[in-house]
Amino acid sequence: MTLSGSGSASDMSGQTVLSADDADIDVVGEGDEALDKDSECESTAGHTDEVGELGGKEIPRSPSGSGTEAEGKGESQQQQQEGIQNKPKNSLVKPPYSYIALITMSILQSPQKKLTLSGICEFISNRFPYYREKFPAWQNSIRHNLSLNDCFVKIPREPGNPGKGNYWTLDPQSEDMFDNGSFLRRRKRFKRQQQDSLREQTALMMQSFGAYSLASPYGRHYGLHPAAYTHPAALQYPYIPPVGHMLPPAVPLLPSSELTRKAFSSQLSPSLQLQLSSLSSTAASIIKSEPSSRPSFSIENIIGVSAASSAAPHTFLRPPVTVQSALMSHQPLALSRSTAAIGPILSVPTNLISGQFLPTAAAAVAKWPAQ
């Protein structure tokens, strides 16, 4: 009993021990399971950490490779674009020459040393690509430089040479316009000097047409002057046609006596008055030297002369030799620059002129026999 009891007790204790062991085992098992769970968690966490590390390493690698490839592609595209842009930039560089230099180049390279506007533009376009690509914009500049600079001379086109536009050439005096033959440097602006012969011809033309120029700055004086210009027509032809219809009236309307006194005493110089008096005496001597048998007048004229002499002793008819012919045939007499100067003299009645300058003509006429 004791043994059994002890055995039972031992069994019980053993059972209890076993149960305790079992309990301990169970506890250990639970701990192992917890450890296993912890190890599994740690392994999963480590695996996830490794995967995270691997993923973190792989993720930056993939974009880094694509970025380098993109950068390489971008650089290649930029280089291609720069290469494409560099080609036209090199051809669009504006030449360092002025328009005058370009025109001079084109004229000098031509065989005839003259070109039209179209020929000049064609040479510049073929020589310089910049102007070839911008052709219509600079053509007016070439035209303005041709017309505004004295170094370029316009040559009209010959009648038998068909075409359009005039020729342009260089002035011979503008050869040294550029410094040492370099078209990059121009010494100074060339100005054409007017020749002396052209100036003399212009002055002669102004003197010739000065009498008919109403807008002349020097004005126009009617009458005779001591130092006046002798018209060539007065020396070649004995008779000058009247020009009264071309000129306005120069002498105011006055009585005949006042007109005679003022027109000749004020406008004629003393030397001319002496010459006219000598002409009157010469005319009187010519009339006296003519033969008396020459039939110069009719009966009606003689009767008219006698009546006029009785009414006005100082007025007579015109003698055979007129004052106009004497004035025109006398060479030393200085006339005005045109026929307008003798207009007042021709407008005076002839009987007044003969009465003043030929007082002895009445006696000569009275001696002629009537027929």
From Swiss-Prot:
UniProt KW DNA-binding keyword: yes
Tissues of expression: Initially located within the dorsal blastopore lip (Spemann organizer) at the mid-gastrula stage. As expression fades in the neuroectoderm, expression begins in the head mesoderm in two regions at the lateral borders of the presumptive neural plate. These regions correspond to neural crest cells originating from the mesencephalon (anterior) and the rhombencephalon (posterior; rhombomeres 2, 4 and 6). Subsequently expressed within trunk premigratory neural crest cells.
Subcellular localization: Nucleus
DNA-binding region: 94-188
Induction trigger: By dorsal wnt signaling. Inhibited by bmp signaling.
Keyword Repressor listed: yes
Chief subcellular location: nucleus
Matches recorded under SUPFAM superfamilies: Winged helix' DNA-binding domain (SSF46785)
GO CC list: nucleus
Annotated phenotype, changing residue 140 to A: Reduces mesoderm-inducing activity
Biased composition (Acidic residues): 21-33
Composition skew (Low complexity), residue ranges: 75-85
GO biological process, one term: positive regulation of neurogenesis
InterPro entries to which the protein is assigned, alphabetical: FH_FOXD3, Fork_head_dom, FOX_domain-containing, TF_fork_head_CS_2, WH-like_DNA-bd_sf, WH_DNA-bd_sf
Any matching Pfam family: Forkhead
Region of interest called tle4-binding, as start-end residue ranges on this chain: 297-303
Compositionally biased residues, Polar residues: 1-18
Disulfide bonds: none
GO molecular function terms listed in the Swiss-Prot or TrEMBL record: DNA binding; DNA-binding transcription factor activity, RNA polymerase II-specific; RNA polymerase II cis-regulatory region sequence-specific DNA binding
SMART domains: FH
Chain residue ranges for the region called Disordered: 1-90
Assembly description: Interacts with tle4.
Entry domain remark: The C-terminus is required for transcriptional repression and mesoderm induction.
Function: Transcriptional repressor that is an essential upstream regulator of neural crest determination and mesoderm induction. Functions by recruiting the transcriptional corepressor tle4. Also acts in a negative auto-regulator loop by inhibiting the transcription of its own gene.
Protein name, per record: Forkhead box protein D3-A
Naturally occurring in which organism (per UniProt): Xenopus laevis (African clawed frog)
Organism lineage string: Eukaryota, Metazoa, Chordata, Craniata, Vertebrata
